[in-house]
């Protein structure tokens, strides 16, 4: 229906999820490994449902002949798979899906590693037209170093909490996890403000353009700003305005 109402503009993104907190509430006993297996069964089934008159008899789902209606305008509807490990890259490419990757807070070295994994998957499936590859990164554009340091500090806070949620060890009350302590900050120098400034896409418009050009040269053909962070509304607004006004024209 969304594809019809948007006149064929829908892209469908599928991922296995990340947090044990979510797995435990979705299905007790579910872990990342099984979530990945379920995703691998789900994706081909969704592709066939969009074609229509599809019967499924899998390990996790079984249903009689079924069709998704109304029929989508796009044939096929573009599907994106979030991937980090080589097996997921290979699965996505083998099934004709586009791929989205993120280096998280690991920097440009990891950006290249992820591209290498994608290229390996494409080389293993020469019969499949090369899918698109999207890079997702936390991005903050500002004019002064003072603003950039403040933005980097907000990203540090985000990743500290991201890791705490991921470990699923801290108590959660009223939907919020316990606050980060100074000891936890000190124990993770890899998430220092300086490293956030270097590893995330943080910089002046010219600096951000230069790094985006380097990703384009690697072979990435789409970019997505990871906006979720510990920044204020005003920081996010000003960041987006600068990106739109001064970064995007370089790629028009």
Short names for language-model regions:
Residues 2, 46, 79, 92, ...:
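Conserved, mostly hydrophobic/aromatic
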Residues 5, 95, 218-220:
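Structural motif
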Residues 10-14, 79-82, 97-102, 131-138, ...:
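Hydrophobic faces of well-ordered beta-strands that scaffold small-molecule active sites
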Residues 19-30, 94-96:
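Acidic/polar active-site rim loop that often engages polyanionic ligands
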Residues 38, 42, 240-252:
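Alpha-helix-loop-beta-strand connector modules within alpha/beta enzyme cores
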